[in-house]
Amino acid sequence: MVLENLVIPFQINNIIKGTIVRLSSVASQIINNEYPQNVNSIFADSISITASIGSRMKNDGVFSFQAHSEGIIKTIFVDLNNNSSIRGYISVNNFENIENLPFEKLISNGTLALNIKEGKFAKNYQGLVEIKGKSIK
C-alpha cells in the first residue's frame, strides 16, 4: 500500500533534519490542469514547501506562502492551518505559448512572503525575500 498524502519530519543523529512530503491527491485537487506543466510544477513546489514548513507548527494557527511577481505568474498563495487543511491559488496573466518559458520569465521581480500566525494571542511572524534563481525551492 502506497500512501498518497503524507508529511513526515525526520532527524538523523541531531545533525540532519528534514521533511518527506508527498501530496498526490491533495495537490491534484488544488492544481488547475489548464495551466502548462512548468506553471503547475512551480505551484506544486509551493504547495510542498507550505506543507513541509507549516506541518511543524505546534499551536493553533496558519502558515502561509505568498509569492508576487511582475512575470507571467502574478500571485501564488498557499496556506495550511493547524487541522492540516491546505488550500492554494495561482494567478497567471497570460498562459498562451508559455510552455517552454524558464522560471525567470514566469516569475520576474518577485517577492516571497512566509507568514506564521500561531493562536489568537500569539505574535505574527513574517519573512520577506526576493525571488532569485531558477526555482522557487
Question: PLM features: residue spans?
Answer:
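Short helix/strand-capping turn motifs
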Residues: 124-128
